[in-house]
Amino acid sequence: MSELICNELSKSYQNFQLSPTSFQLESGYLTVLSGKNGSGKSTLLRCLSGVDPFCTGDAKLDGISLKNEPDLYKDQIGYVSDELTYFMEKSALENGALLGPYFSNWSMERYYILMDRMDFSPSRQLWQLSKGEYMKMQTCFALAHNPRFLIMDEPLEGFDPIFRRKFLSIMQDILNEDVGIFISSHITETLKNLADYLMFADNGTISFHCPEQLDAFLTDQRKHSHSQIRDLLSRNF
């Protein structure tokens, strides 16, 4: 079992601050990070994955420090985000051949298998891909170097409902391989069936919830949405 520990990690921009954040994740479990746009979800994931520098604190993966050993740390993290840029004028296969060997556990065979399972055509140049296809490619690449943790920023947005179910089935298989998954997403009934833990971002503050709180949170979200609909109807129609 692997552990990803976030210890007082913080980040400040001109008009936003991610408050010092601490939590611990274990491999084999899916944690969902929810919250409104601009609440700090992407900021936390970018810092935790090593893509963006952070102001204070540290993250450790099985004792490997992001602050002190960033290359070794990032070698064990798979990161997926539509903000990531690969060689956009090249195909997924070319990107795999060029970038994959920089990871110590890269497997081109696993890359092929994952792309086939996700119904992804690897020959097109990346700039030609839709958002959903680009997220498929990134997920395959991230998993092909056999990370201990997979960090994903809103991976479901570009998927149609049919593929979304298939994608979550693949994620369940990844969890069964003892990989930890940390996903930012708007909570849905589909994610409810797979999520083990829930984190919530609100104006730069991150709160952690136990599994038994997930049902109550989702119920409250549904009630809130229904009340918003009723209010909108009463004001406009």
Regions found by a protein language model. Give the residues of each.
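Conserved beta-strand
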Residues: 6-9, 16-29, 57
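The feature captures the beta-strand-to-loop junction immediately N-terminal to the Walker
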Residues: 34-36
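Conserved ABC transporter NBD signature motif
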Residues: 57-68, 72-73
